[in-house]
């Protein structure tokens, strides 16, 4: 699960940078020029993988990174968000 979390974070950061480089997103598409929020969300997801032993913080960081990524890059961040949802679902199953 930790590897999937790191993969999801890296994928989110790469997707947001590539979306800006290939002009998929611009100022009119998202909330201003906040494309870097996708990269920030990817970094937050990777930091959440470090917090796997601290259960509440892990889930909160994953939810926050998904919301920040979607706000920053829009639909470009949907695949990392789906990975985060899968991780949260598996994490809730393990904790029960």
From Swiss-Prot:
Entry keyword set: Cell membrane, Membrane, Transmembrane, Transmembrane helix
Main subcellular location: membrane
Record's subcellular location: Cell membrane
Transmembrane segments: 3-23, 30-50, 68-88
Annotated Gene Ontology cellular component terms: plasma membrane
Recorded topology in the membrane: Multi-pass membrane protein
Protein name (database record): Uncharacterized membrane protein YnxB
Source organism: Bacillus subtilis (strain 168)
């Amino acid at each position: 699960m930790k590897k999937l979390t790191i993969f999801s974070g890296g994928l989110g950061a790469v997707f947001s940078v590539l979306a800006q480089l290939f002009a998929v997103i611009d100022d009119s598409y998202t909330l201003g020029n906040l494309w870097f929020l996708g990269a920030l969300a990817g970094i937050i997801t990777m930091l959440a993988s470090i917090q796997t032993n601290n259960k509440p913080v892990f889930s909160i960081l994953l939810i926050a990174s998904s919301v920040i990524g979607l706000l920053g890059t829009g639909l470009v961040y949907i695949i990392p968000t789906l990975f985060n949802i899968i991780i949260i679902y598996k994490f809730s199953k393990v904790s029960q």
